[in-house]
């Protein structure tokens, strides 16, 4: 097994050991752009990184020079790596751009389980560019878009275009809540459409956006009349979450559900203009009938 050590200008990043002389020498020989801030990933044998109680190995330049002979050979253009002879063994050295990191490190930094990160890589849904170098998967953050993945989206929806004022009120309320919770909002999605219609293009695009980690909405019926728990479970399995601001309004509105269903059915039978009035009359008639039966 090998362990990956990352060297950046001025310091060596490793939780256990620092090898500035070794990594710096290798990076200087293998890459002419090391002075411009390039990184070098060096694969070392596991025994070289093991901790010893007496004197930790590979801590001083003298011990490094005594144990290791650095002779870069066999350049491999096009793959971004070269072979290095270290202590009689051939090891790979990978020179990467700034911002490159191991896929596991990227997953931990973005709050994603490593299993989900590998699954995204296999199905081609990883939201950042990645490349495989030997047995190592390196992730490159897009230039000019640092931290783009993992943003929060505010979702607001209305069933009728006559209530656009309420649509703006939803956006303002949810954004204020996110600001109070110190959650930066990276995207706002508004939509006008029936909660029973399952082919809402704007909402489906939001669900399929891998750069959105958290979706925040005022009430759960803004997502749809039914199926909230299913969508929440699917997003959770993908390392994402669905947040409802007004938890007090989570209780089912039976009258609202019936009105929505009747409106949808009346729109199919009689057209959209008369759908609302016919649905309201049907609900009122049902309420009167229920009152008479109670008497």
Curated annotation (Swiss-Prot):
Superkingdom field: Bacteria
Active-site residues, as the UniProt record annotates them: 159
One of the record's GO molecular function terms: DNA binding
InterPro entries per UniProt: Recombinase/Transposase-rel (IPR051491), Resolv_N (IPR006119), Resolvase-like_N_sf (IPR036162), Transpos_IS607 (IPR048046)
Domain called Resolvase/invertase-type recombinase catalytic: residue spans: 151-290
Pfam families linked: Resolvase
GO cellular component, one term: plasma membrane
Matching NCBIfam families: transpos_IS607 (NF033518)
Name of the protein in question: Uncharacterized protein Rv2886c
Natural source organism: Mycobacterium tuberculosis (strain ATCC 25618 / H37Rv)
């Amino acid at each position: 097994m090998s362990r990956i050590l990352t060297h950046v200008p001025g310091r060596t990043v490793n939780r256990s050991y620092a090898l500035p002389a070794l990594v710096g020498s290798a990076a200087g020989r293998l890459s002419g752009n090391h002075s411009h801030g390039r990184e070098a990933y060096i694969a070392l044998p596991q025994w070289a990184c093991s901790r010893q109680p007496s004197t930790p190995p590979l801590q001083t330049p003298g011990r490094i020079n005594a144990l290791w002979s650095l002779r870069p050979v066999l350049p491999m253009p096009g793959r971004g790596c070269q072979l290095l002879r270290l202590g009689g063994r051939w090891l790979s050295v990978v020179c990467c751009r700034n911002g490159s990191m191991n896929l596991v490190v990227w997953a931990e930094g973005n709050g994603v389980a490593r299993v989900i990160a590998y699954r995204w890589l296999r199905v081609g849904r990883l939201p950042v560019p990645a490349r495989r170098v030997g047995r190592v998967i390196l992730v490159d953050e897009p230039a000019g878009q640092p931290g783009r993945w993992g943003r929060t989206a505010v979702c607001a929806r209305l069933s009728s275009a006559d209530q656009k004022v309420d649509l703006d009120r939803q956006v303002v309320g949810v954004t204020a809540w996110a600001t109070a919770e110190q959650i930066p909002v990276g995207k706002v999605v508004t939509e006008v459409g029936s909660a029973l219609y399952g082919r809402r293009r704007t909402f489906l695009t939001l669900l399929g956006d891998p750069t959105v980690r958290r979706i925040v909405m005022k009430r759960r019926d803004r997502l749809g009349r039914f199926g909230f728990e299913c969508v929440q479970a699917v997003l959770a399995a993908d390392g994402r979450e669905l947040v409802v601001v007004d938890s007090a309004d989570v209780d089912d509105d039976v009258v609202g559900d019936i009105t929505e269903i009747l409106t949808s059915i009346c729109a199919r039978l009689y057209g959209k203009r008369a759908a609302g009035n016919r649905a309201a009359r049907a609900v009122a008639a049902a309420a009167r009938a229920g009152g008479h039966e109670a008497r």
